[in-house]
Amino acid sequence: MKKDIHPNYVEFNATCSCGNVVTTRSTIGKDIHLDVCSACHPFYTGKQKAAETGGRVDKFNKRFAAIGKK
């Protein structure tokens, strides 16, 4: 690698709105603030709400179920 052409790869803190702080390394060189992280995101905490199970396919099947039974 050539010297003095690569950006500095330094440690920085990513602070979430829930208060969780993650230390990682990057070339941005300054601390950042996150809206969500793995400690408070509903997918990772298990508090995720199920999406609507019925959709267009279910509506189609209900509408034409009687025709298919003949």
Curated annotation (Swiss-Prot):
The gene is rpmE. PANTHER family: 50S RIBOSOMAL PROTEIN L31, CHLOROPLASTIC (PTHR33280), LARGE RIBOSOMAL SUBUNIT PROTEIN BL31A (PTHR33280:SF6). InterPro entries: Ribosomal_bL28/bL31-like_sf, Ribosomal_bL31, Ribosomal_bL31_A, Ribosomal_bL31_sf. Binds 1 zinc ion per subunit. Belongs to the bacterial ribosomal protein bL31 family. Type A subfamily. The lineage of its organism: Bacteria, Pseudomonadati, Pseudomonadota, Gammaproteobacteria, Alteromonadales. Binds the 23S rRNA. Part of the 50S ribosomal subunit. Gene3D superfamilies: Ribosomal protein L31. It comes from the Bacteria. Keywords: Metal-binding, Ribonucleoprotein, Ribosomal protein, RNA-binding, rRNA-binding, Zinc. This is Large ribosomal subunit protein bL31. Zn(2+) binds at residues 16, 18, 37, 40. Pfam families: Ribosomal_L31. One of its GO terms (biological process) is translation. GO terms for molecular function: metal ion binding; rRNA binding; structural constituent of ribosome. One of its GO terms (cellular component) is ribonucleoprotein complex. Its cofactor is Zn(2+).
